[in-house]
Each structure stands twice: as structure tokens, then as C-alpha cells.
Amino acid sequence: MNPVDLIIKRAYPYETEKRDRIYLALNENPFPFPKELTEEVFRKLEGDKMRIYYDSPDEELIEKILEYLDADFLRENNVSIGNGADEIIYVMMLMFERAVFFPPTYSCYRIFAKAVGAKYLEIPLTKYLKIPEVDVGEGDVVFIPNPNNPTGHVFEREEIEKILKKGAFVALDEAYYEFHGESYIDLLKEYENLAIIRTFSKAFSLAAQRIGYVISSEKFIDAYNRVRLPFNVSYVSQTFAKVALEHIDIFKERIEYIVSERERMKKALKELNYSISDSRGNFVFIFMDRKEQNKLIEQLRQKNIAVRSFREGVRITIGKREENETILKELEVFR
């Protein structure tokens, strides 16, 4: 078969929707990147640095990431960056013999595996949302979002270590770390077959700038840097990230707001007798069969509200309070 036809047959595009409504489908931060910080970025940008192939990553950004991580065992050669966390995941699909993941999980794991023609294994989480028994070893990369996406629940440390001890490489996707506040980053001191993936998209309102970072052993980072594209993150994006890290307190205040709204939403949904997960992300997840989902999504569509549907239920991004109130009222009517 023609290679182009083969790709079209096996892979499918990641599709997005118009934003002409209350859009609570992609776990975006409800707050815009602060205007005063955008102005600071523009003041810092230098025309001469625009014309060159800018270092990716630049040393100053790595230093600021290390300061943010506040882990004294990490050094500059333990960190690299990607064009969004997605590029890091995509590159890792190319680095290993097989990808393993546990649905319900981040949909791009499967999308990227199919796009690059990688071997992959999907084994559903148990009914209690635990990682199932799986036969893995060297050559496998196991992708685990923690908190999980789309359910938002957190995996136990023992579940992660069980896979690490089998020799497989674990990519712990901590895209929603800031909304949970706890990390297994200390496991890097014991396991070289572990990488932590983070992003500036969620907590820092920088999804459009496409910048993520990966923390791992010096050996893995060296290998990753050899496979990723050179100059993969723009000078502008790196400058936005550096400025964000210089003003952490602004974002901490916003994170507290989102977490408070998440907990309020969870409480309200329980009072409405919805079955929900214990989400620690910037979203809530309602378990719901397809028939119910279709009815709910149609009702929300008529009210110009978009959420995300999965086989197991519906994920709703935490928006600003008025948006959350609007969807809670619709969920009360639906109930």
C-alpha cells in the first residue's frame, strides 16, 4: 500500500471544535495569561534573537525550571523541553519498541502511536480504576497520567513502582500536577527507567505557546535530545515560560481558585446523585453510559456548552464560577 494511504488508513487526526460557546472540553485554564506579564515578555524580546536558530532549551529556562522543581538531586542535564508535552510523548513513541497505556487515559497516546506506526498495547484500568497486571519489560514505555486524564484520580505510588521494578520505562505524565500538588518526582532518585512529563499549558495559561518539559536521568535526557527536533521550542515560547516562572505567586492564586471550584463542583454533583471520580485535575468526571451521555451532550449543545465525552463518562473542565454555575444548573435539570 502507498505509504500516504497507509497513514490515512491507520491514523486519525486530532479534531477540535469552534469556540463560539462555553467551552469546557479541553481542560484549558479559564484565566488568560496576565496582560502585565505579556507586556513584560514583549519588553524582553530582542529582534536579533528572533533571526537566529535559538537554543532549545536555553540555559536560563532550565535554571528556572530547576528552581521551580526545588529538588536538590536534579541538575541541568536532568531536564529538557518539548513543543508542548505532546511532542515529548510523540518522541518517546519513536524511542521505544512498544507503548503501553491503560484506558480511560489520555487519547493522544493512542493517536500518536498509530500516527508513527508504533506497536502499542492497551489494557483497561480495573473497575476500581487501578493499574491492571501487565507483562512489560525493557523495550516498553508505559504512559501513566497522574492525576489521570480523563478521570482525574491519582494512582498509588506502589502501582507505579510495581511497573518500574519490571524494567519497563515509565513516562509519568504530570500535566495536572499543580492542581494536585503532589508528585512522585523523588522516585527519580531510585529509578533510571522513569521520566516525569510536565507542561506550561494548564496551570500557566500557555497552551497556545506549546511548551512542556521532561525530567529524567542524564542518560535518558541525552537520548531524548538526540531524537527530538533541534530548535524545537521557539524563543518567544521560552521567554513566556521564563516570565511565568518569575511570577509563580500569580499562578498559585489562580490554581487555588480552580481547585476550590473543582471541590465545590464535586460536592454539588454528589448532592445531585451523580457518580463521579475523585478528580485532582482541573476538571470533574461523571461516570455515565453512552445513552445518557448523548442526551446530556445534546441538552448542553442547545445551551451552547461543550464538554468532552468518553466511553466511560463525561469530563467537564473547571471554568470560572459563572460558567460552572451554568453547567451545574443544566446538570440539575438533566437529573
Curated annotation (Swiss-Prot):
<dbReference type="InterPro" id="IPR015421">
    <property type="entry name" value="PyrdxlP-dep_Trfase_major"/>
</dbReference>
<dbReference type="GO" id="GO:0030170">
    <property type="term" value="F:pyridoxal phosphate binding"/>
</dbReference>
<dbReference type="GO" id="GO:0000105">
    <property type="term" value="P:L-histidine biosynthetic process"/>
</dbReference>
<dbReference type="InterPro" id="IPR050106">
    <property type="entry name" value="HistidinolP_aminotransfase"/>
</dbReference>
<keyword id="KW-0368">Histidine biosynthesis</keyword>
<dbReference type="InterPro" id="IPR004839">
    <property type="entry name" value="Aminotransferase_I/II_large"/>
</dbReference>
<comment type="pathway">
    <text>Amino-acid biosynthesis; L-histidine biosynthesis; L-histidine from 5-phospho-alpha-D-ribose 1-diphosphate: step 7/9.</text>
</comment>
<dbReference type="InterPro" id="IPR001917">
    <property type="entry name" value="Aminotrans_II_pyridoxalP_BS"/>
</dbReference>
<dbReference type="InterPro" id="IPR015422">
    <property type="entry name" value="PyrdxlP-dep_Trfase_small"/>
</dbReference>
<dbReference type="InterPro" id="IPR015424">
    <property type="entry name" value="PyrdxlP-dep_Trfase"/>
</dbReference>
<comment type="similarity">
    <text>Belongs to the class-II pyridoxal-phosphate-dependent aminotransferase family. Histidinol-phosphate aminotransferase subfamily.</text>
</comment>
<dbReference type="GO" id="GO:0004400">
    <property type="term" value="F:histidinol-phosphate transaminase activity"/>
</dbReference>
<dbReference type="Pfam" id="PF00155">
    <property type="entry name" value="Aminotran_1_2"/>
</dbReference>
<keyword id="KW-0663">Pyridoxal phosphate</keyword>
<keyword id="KW-0808">Transferase</keyword>
<keyword id="KW-0028">Amino-acid biosynthesis</keyword>
<dbReference type="InterPro" id="IPR005861">
    <property type="entry name" value="HisP_aminotrans"/>
</dbReference>
<protein>
    <recommendedName>
        <fullName>Histidinol-phosphate aminotransferase</fullName>
        <ecNumber>2.6.1.9</ecNumber>
    </recommendedName>
</protein>
<comment type="subunit">
    <text>Homodimer.</text>
</comment>
<keyword id="KW-0032">Aminotransferase</keyword>
<feature type="modified residue" description="N6-(pyridoxal phosphate)lysine">
    <location>
        <position position="202"/>
    </location>
</feature>
